[in-house]
Amino acid sequence: MATPTQSPTNVPEETDPFFYDYATVQTVGMTLATIMFVLGIIIIISKKVKCRKADSRSESPTCKSCKSELPSSAPGGGGV
């Protein structure tokens, strides 16, 4: 067994500036993750609902996300 070469010194304990209440950090993190997840689902669903309401006989849908442009249809763009 090894024996210590120096006697332990009594250093006054200072408060750790990087002390975290991990239960609170975990609770806040899970709450924010849940809120962002639900908002993402709502945004995805709302965009799909807008596209479904567009008139199917119309050539241009009402929402921009439903339009699909081909790279060859861009002005000045060449074909494939």
UniProtKB/Swiss-Prot annotation:
Domain of life: Eukaryota
Gene3D superfamilies, per database record: Single helix bin (1.20.5.780)
InterPro entries in alphabetical order: FXYD7, FXYD_motif, Ion-transport_regulator_FXYD
Ranges where the record places region Disordered: 56-80
Residues exposed to the Extracellular side: 1-22
Alphabetized UniProt keyword annotations: Cell membrane, Glycoprotein, Ion transport, Membrane, Phosphoprotein, Potassium, Potassium transport, Sodium, Sodium transport, Sodium/potassium transport, Transmembrane, Transmembrane helix, Transport
Record's comment on post-translational modification: O-glycosylated; required for stabilization and translocation to the plasma membrane.
Gene Ontology molecular-function annotations: ATPase binding; sodium channel regulator activity
Segments passing through the bilayer: 23-45
Gene Ontology cellular component terms for the protein in this record: plasma membrane
GO BP, sorted A to Z: positive regulation of sodium ion export across plasma membrane; potassium ion transport; regulation of monoatomic ion transport; sodium ion transport
Residues bearing PTM Phosphoserine: 73
Keyword hit for Zinc-finger: no
Chief site of localization: membrane
Membrane-related topology note: Single-pass type I membrane protein
Cytoplasmic side: 46-80
Tissue localization of expression: Expressed specifically in brain. Expressed in both neurons and glia.
Signal peptide: none
Phenotypic consequence of residue 9 to A: Does not inhibit cell surface expression. Inhibits cell surface expression
Glycan-linked positions: 3, 5, 9
Physiological role: Associates with and regulates the activity of the sodium/potassium-transporting ATPase (NKA) which catalyzes the hydrolysis of ATP coupled with the exchange of Na(+) and K(+) ions across the plasma membrane. Reduces the apparent affinity for external K(+), an effect that depends on the presence of external Na(+) and voltage. Increases the apparent affinity for intracellular Na(+).
Entry comment, domain topic: The transmembrane domain is important for the interaction with NKA and with the functional effect of FXYD7.
Oligomer status and interactors: Regulatory subunit of the sodium/potassium-transporting ATPase which is composed of a catalytic alpha subunit, a non-catalytic beta subunit and an additional regulatory subunit. The regulatory subunit, a member of the FXYD protein family, modulates the enzymatic activity in a tissue- and isoform-specific way by changing affinities of the Na+/K+-ATPase toward Na(+), K(+) or ATP.
Family: Belongs to the FXYD family.
Protein's UniProt name: FXYD domain-containing ion transport regulator 7
Organism listed in the record: Rattus norvegicus (Rat)
Classification of source organism: Eukaryota, Metazoa, Chordata, Craniata, Vertebrata
Gene name of the encoded protein: Fxyd7
